[in-house]
Amino acid sequence: MGSLQTPIEMRSSSLLDTSCGYLLRELQMIWDEVGEDKFEREKVLLDIEQECVEAYRRKVDHANVSRSRLHQELAESEAELTHFLLCLGERSVPGRPEKKGGTLREQLDSIAPALREMRLRKDERVKQFRSVKGEIQKISAEIAGRSTYEDSTRKITIDDNDLSNKKLEEYQNELHRLHDEKNERLQKVDIYICAIRDLSATLGTEASMIITKIHPSLNDLYGISKNISDDILKKLNGTVVSLEEEKHKRLEKLHHLGRALSNLWNLMDASYEDRQKFFHVIDLLSSAPSDVCAPGSITLDIIQQAEAEVKRLDQLKASRIKELFIKKQKELEDTCNMSHMETPSTEMGNITNLVDSGEVDHVDLLAAMDEKIARAKEEAASRKGIIEKVDRWMLASDEERWLEEYDQDENRYSVSRNAHRNLRRAERARITVSKISGLVESILVKAKSWEVERQKVFLYNEVPLVAMLQEYNKLRQEKEMEKQRLREMKKMSIPQPVAEGDNFYMARPASSNRRISNRSMNGGFGSGSPINRKYSGGFNNTNNNYTALGTSIRRESRKSEA
């Protein structure tokens, strides 16, 4: 008990100034009054002391827990502050003391303002990141051709571990680059749209429909942001290229039509009123594609009007060329007929088709005709002397035929109205007939010389002249032999002498008379003569046959081009 008494007294003395000490004294008074045993008192006091110890232990444990929590909070605050410094790229917190001191609560109180400041900075930095990344996503969506609504549904992710100014500056640089790219694309779109409008105005097409067909956002009437994606830029560029090609194509067509109009005007001697309607087409001849930009200058209506005018003038030209060609053909035929040459055959329908199709130009056609006329005239000039002698021979042959018929007339010496006139003609005819042999020989010499010089046969109405003359000489010799035979027969049958001059043209057998009387103007040979049977075409075959001129003109034009 003594060992316990001291602690009790010590504890009692320590509790005198406390409520516990007061209660202990009150308990002792009660015990004294009751007469409680010391042992029991000691036991109760031990129980009280044990309970006090446990109460203190609980308080100490609670205090330890609180202290640990404060340590943890302080560590977490320090860690959070350090994290803020790292993610924000800050080296220190302004206003926070470098040395750490004081109680835990004081330390927490000292770090709390820095944490609040860093949280505010982080929140502000996150807002900046969200704003910049949102703009980046928006512009990227515009460049990619996605709608802003579709892109706004995407969540903006922020990396909390890197919110430094350096990272923010990188995003801002990216945003600045995207802004520049967007502006550049918008400028390209505006340039393309402006080019489409200018080209459409020049071509006379509706620019609004073309632009809307590419994408509705490009039309200002829709009031939405313009699509600036690569696909749209590609379509715009393709549209501009297509319009430029159409412009070049139309301009080339108008150049062709303008040259055709100019040539036709000069050829047809068109009036000023007819030309004035298409002066704008002629003005384009000296214009390059880059110079043609006036609205409505190369519309389809202008091209169609020019085509219609060219077609009209071509038809008029074809009609006049046909008239001119027929005139030249008549000149060629007259030249050939006068010189008894074969007329080159032509086919007017084929000629017209060749001119219309463009295979033969009217200039080449007329030049070919002029060349044929020139050749015909040159050949006619070379044949002139021979033809004149042939004509004289033909006339002499007619006289010879008439004289034969006259000599066979038994009543030629009878007194009649025309007897004296016929007698005088017979005298002249005998003189003419006597010169036929020399004339024929002269023609043969000249014709053979002409054939040697020209290296071709001399044709008279499509019949070889030399052969015709040789046949004539042969028949003339036969006729002389027949005359000689008849003379001998008469001498044998009639003893009286008869003057040869009076009996030269006595009656002849019917076969001889028929053969001689059937001789025609064409060299004095009838249809039954060998020369006419051989050359059945005759001497006067001057029909207008156009079967081969188209081919010959094409051949000659190709030769001249070669």
From Swiss-Prot:
What keywords would UniProt list here?
A: Cell cycle, Cell division, Coiled coil, Cytoplasm, Cytoskeleton, Microtubule, Mitosis, Nucleus
User: What's a Pfam family in this record?
Assistant: MAP65_ASE1
State where it is primarily located: nucleus
**Is Cell cycle tagged as a keyword?**
yes
Per the record, which residues fall in region Disordered?
Answer: 542-562
The cross-references to InterPro entries, in alphabetical order and at most eight, read: MAP65_Ase1_PRC1 (IPR007145)
Q: Disulfide connectivity? A: none
Q: Which residues form a coiled coil?
A: 61-81, 155-190, 299-324, 361-381, 465-494
User: In what ranges is there compositional bias, type Basic and acidic residues?
Assistant: 553-562
Locate the site labelled Microtubule binding: A426
Localisation: Nucleus; Cytoplasm; Cytoplasm, Cytoskeleton, Spindle pole
Q: Name one GO biological process term.
A: microtubule cytoskeleton organization
Nucleus in keyword set: yes
Q: Could you give the subunit structure recorded for this chain? A: Forms a dimer. Binds to microtubules (MT). Bundles polymerized MT via the formation of 25-nm crossbridges following an intracellular dotted lines pattern and at the minus-end of phragmoplast MT near the nuclear surface.
Q: Return the protein name.
A: 65-kDa microtubule-associated protein 8
What organism is the protein native to?
Answer: Arabidopsis thaliana (Mouse-ear cress)
